[in-house]
C-alpha cells in the first residue's frame, strides 16, 4: 500500500546520504 512505498522511498533517501 502507499505507506509501504513511502517507507521504501525514505529508506532509499537515507541510504543516499
Swiss-Prot record:
GO terms for cellular component: extracellular region; synapse. Keywords: Neuropeptide, Neurotransmitter, Opioid peptide, Secreted. It is found in: Secreted. It comes from the Eukaryota. GO terms for molecular function: opioid peptide activity. The keyword Cytoplasm does not apply. One of its GO terms (biological process) is chemical synaptic transmission. Ligand of the opioid receptor-like receptor OPRL1. It may act as a transmitter in the brain by modulating nociceptive and locomotor behavior. May be involved in neuronal differentiation and development. When administered intracerebroventricularly into mice, this peptide induces hyperalgesia and decreases locomotor activity. Belongs to the opioid neuropeptide precursor family. This is Nociceptin. It comes from Sus scrofa.
